[in-house]
A protein has these predicted regions:
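Short, conserved beta-strand segments within well-ordered enzyme catalytic domains
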Residues: 36-38, 66-68, 90
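Internal catalytic or translocation cores that form aromatic/hydrophobic pockets or channels
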Residues: 59-65, 86, 91
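The alpha/beta-hydrolase serine catalytic core
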Residues: 87-194
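Active-site phosphate/pyrophosphate- and oxyanion-stabilizing loops and adjacent acidic/basic residues
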Residues: 22, 26, 78, 156-159
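Gly/Ala-rich beta-loop-alpha elbow adjacent to hydrolase catalytic centers
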Residues: 68-77
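Short hydrophobic segments within beta-strands
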Residues: 8-12, 68, 145
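Aromatic pocket-lining residues of Rossmann-like dinucleotide-binding sites
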Residues: 80-84
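Active-site catalytic motif of lipid deacylating hydrolases and related acyltransferases
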Residues: 2-63
Length: 194
């Protein structure tokens, strides 16, 4: 079934103003204006973020929705895809954010607006642990774009988390996927936008 509703989930300290989110939104609005696009600003609390997302998509047609997530958003996208059975595209997805973000508790600045501050509370690490899911139920619903040159996350761990999924392993690249323009069409083709 073609995707009629598309959710984009940004990463830690990121926002709907990320380069990837803006490029995807522009492409969807230009070429598939009938597709419902939603890229919310996620709260710092993982539990609050997932509660907001799950409420926001509660009336979406599960067979015709998809999710894209970058970094921590990829972890969240896996949670959403496992809960709904939808397709998911993961862009350098975080695999164990409870481990990786444990050292980032306290006040943080927003990546796209350094004047904006938020607090990443210690108990948010436990919330991340509670959102972790086991092996994915339907690996054919997943497409991961993973850069071996990611300076933040281990590409081997990312690739190993999604056995049986479609994986595009980039020989170089970086965590931000600075060459994302080269991958947009493949991402959107996987999602079969209606």
């Amino acid at each position: 079934m073609a995707t009629t509703h598309l959710l984009y989930l940004h990463g830690f300290r990121s926002s709907p103003q990320s380069t990837k989110a803006r490029k995807l939104e522009a492409r969807v609005r230009e070429h598939r204006p009938q597709v419902h696009w939603w890229c919310p600003q996620l709260p710092a609390s993982p539990r609050a973020a997932m509660d907001m997302v799950m409420q926001g998509i509660a009336r979406w047609p599960q067979g015709a929705m998809a999710v894209i997530g970058s970094s921590l958003g990829g972890f969240y996208a896996t949670f959403v895809a496992e809960a709904t059975g939808c397709r998911a595209v993961l862009l350098n997805p975080a695999i164990d954010p409870a481990r990786d973000l444990g050292g980032y508790t306290g006040e943080q600045t927003a990546w796209h607006n350094p004047g904006e501050r938020f607090v990443f509370e210690p108990h948010f690490v436990d919330e991340l642990r509670s959102l972790r899911r086991g092996p994915v139920a339907r690996p054919e619903n997943y497409f991961a774009v993973i850069a071996k040159g990611d300076e933040v996350l281990d590409w081997r761990e990312m690739a190993g988390r999604y056995p049986g999924a479609k994986i595009k392993l980039l020989e170089a690249g970086d965590h931000a996927l600075s060459d994302f323009d080269r991958h947009i069409e493949e991402v959107l083709a996987f999602l079969d936008l209606g």
